[in-house]
């Protein structure tokens, strides 16, 4: 994998704004409005939840690691910014993105075995498909993604800050789950992986279960993170918002002081690529931040260990070059996703997908 996210095709070609994504999807719908009207689909978040579950199911049958599943989900999102969902058999695409991700993550699987497992899992929707169809779909997938197959994930950044922030095993487990869950949103197409990782850390700190409530872990365990969000309620969300607001206020105050001193009109290096490599930051600089600025960020003694850790995290953010506005957006998107998950109906989503597959003979 390429070490430098900032020089990667992911950053150059596969990071969009929300407005860009909305325009792309609208353009795909406008290509065949009759098809859209004839075969309505659930909202995109519910489709993402369903696709995530199916990738997890197929992966477990084969024994694949989380990294492979994550890469497959990114491929799926990229592909569906180029091709309308209703033009494809999603089960064939799910099989193919997982097959291709296995190759890229250096754990290749035989195409016949992958096809056999997929047909066993979705017999009514893939009964007419053979390995040749997966091979054809793979060619189309690579072509539509312009052979941009290297994917930078947030997991490495999360592991890189575990000791830095003194994260407990429960906090790491919850943060890992939040990262798993972000693949059911548009965040992999919107923000750099280190921003997602830091957002996951913040949410793990403020939504962390009590001592007698086990944290959720594992692949795609969004029920655990959603339950933690529900248990924390508005208080946990408010704590996250306050931490980000404090960090942003310190950044703005520092910028104003520099401007007043005649040293420049903005925060030096804010969002610069030099200090935001794949890990998102320099460990040495971050240690200095924690030791040097945390005292200034904590004017009074904090007795709650969790609140103290959140405040230290906010102080570190203020002294870093991390895009705090992007973290705010990530936080809002994830909280909104957990709320949306409450309305998810698996049976309805499956029926809507199967309806257009059968009607258009895409299962043959």
Curated annotation (Swiss-Prot):
Residues 268-303 are annotated as: Disordered. Keywords: Activator, Cyclin, Nucleus, Repressor, Transcription, Transcription regulation. Coiled coil: none annotated. One of its GO terms (molecular function) is cyclin-dependent protein serine/threonine kinase regulator activity. It comes from the Eukaryota. One of its GO terms (cellular component) is nucleus. The keyword Nucleus applies. It is found in: Nucleus. This is RNA polymerase II holoenzyme cyclin-like subunit.
